[in-house]
């Protein structure tokens, strides 16, 4: 089986035999291009122009023939036949998906296909697990170190798909009371793109739900500085409003902010980590309620004392 990894720096092997130098050779990049466009035949002349567009048609086609010869030679050296994977004729070239192969990009997209139109709070447990498997495959941007124009578009598309999937998992964990895990996914998103203001807002709310209002405010200031330094803008009105609500204690307390229409899970189906996290959240909430109740009682006592003094 041919196994190709295009995320990160990339590598390829035929069974246990690595293909040395992959993908940093023009012939290997042609193979990468065919893999990324595996569902379509590629016109030979157009394919040649993608890689050798600065040359005449005759010269670019010659370079393409040389690349195919190089691929055939490399495949033979690891015990594979190029004809099992590439359909080559005078007019076109195509990757044969009928051959035995495994491609990380293809698996990644297939795992995410069923949840593409779902929001994070709409995911069930199996769908969330599928999404986690897909994200585990993404250990770096597509073909890092390759700056060809054809690669940049695919890199951006797959990066957005990856980041949006992380955001869905962040929301999924919030909606299932797993706030710490939600924060971990938020940190992973910001590691790729720390200017995502919606993620900073989500993290502010997750800290609040954990009973850590000071960390929620710190997250806002972190967001504010990043946007100012890297983009030259201030946080938008939604983020500022959320900050002001939290700063002046007008934001709903954890018990009020989370409302779920889902039925309560059977305790037998809740793992220990989830149950522990929920219990910690409840403790934080009860402590806050006690503090607020004490403050209210002190106000009432002060009013009663004032009324008593006036009546004397």
Q: PLM features: residue spans?
A:
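DNA-binding patch around the recognition helix
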Residues: 1-5, 66-98, 225-237
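Short boundary/linker motifs that mark transitions into or out of structured domains
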Residues: 1-30, 84-92, 104, 140, ...
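Short amphipathic alpha-helical recognition elements used for nucleic-acid or partner binding
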Residues: 20-51, 71, 198-200
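DNA-recognition element of transcription regulators
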Residues: 23-32, 57-79
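Conserved amphipathic alpha-helical interaction elements at protein-protein interfaces in regulatory
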Residues: 36-37, 53, 77, 229
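Ca2+-coordinating acidic residues in Ca2+-binding motifs
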Residues: 46, 63, 107
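Intrinsically disordered, charged and Pro/Gly-enriched terminal/linker segments
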Residues: 56-57, 92-312
């Amino acid at each position: 089986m041919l196994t190709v990894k295009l995320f990160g720096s990339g590598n390829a092997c035929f069974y246990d035999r690595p293909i040395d130098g992959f993908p940093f050779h023009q012939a290997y990049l042609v193979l990468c291009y065919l893999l990324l466009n595996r569902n379509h035949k590629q016109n030979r002349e157009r394919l040649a122009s993608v890689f050798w567009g600065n040359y005449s048609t005759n010269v670019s086609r010659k370079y393409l023939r040389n690349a195919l010869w190089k691929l055939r030679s490399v495949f033979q050296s690891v015990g594979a036949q190029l004809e099992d994977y590439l359909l080559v004729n005078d007019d076109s070239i195509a990757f044969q998906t009928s051959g035995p192969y495994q491609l990380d990009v293809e698996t990644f997209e297939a795992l995410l296909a069923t949840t593409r139109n779902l929001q994070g709070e709409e995911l069930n447990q199996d769908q969330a697990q599928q999404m986690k498997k897909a994200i585990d495959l993404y250990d770096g941007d597509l073909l890092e170190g390759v700056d060809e124009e054809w690669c940049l578009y695919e890199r951006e598309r797959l990066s957005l798909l990856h980041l949006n999937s992380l955001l869905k998992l962040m929301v999924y964990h919030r909606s299932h009371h797993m706030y710490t895990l939600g924060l971990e996914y938020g940190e992973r998103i910001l590691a790729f793109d720390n200017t995502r203001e919606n993620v900073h807002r989500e993290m502010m709310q997750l800290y609040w739900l954990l009973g850590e209002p000071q960390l929620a405010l710190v997250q806002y200031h972190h967001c504010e500085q990043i946007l100012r330094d890297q983009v030259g803008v201030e946080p938008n009105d939604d983020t500022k409003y959320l900050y002001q609500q939290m700063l002046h204690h007008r934001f709903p307390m954890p018990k009020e902010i989370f409302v779920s229409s889902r039925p309560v899970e059977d305790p037998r189906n809740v793992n220990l980590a989830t149950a522990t996290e929920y219990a910690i959240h409840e403790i934080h909430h009860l402590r806050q309620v006690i503090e607020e109740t004490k403050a209210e009682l002190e106000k009432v006592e002060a009013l009663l004392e004032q009324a008593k003094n006036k009546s004397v």
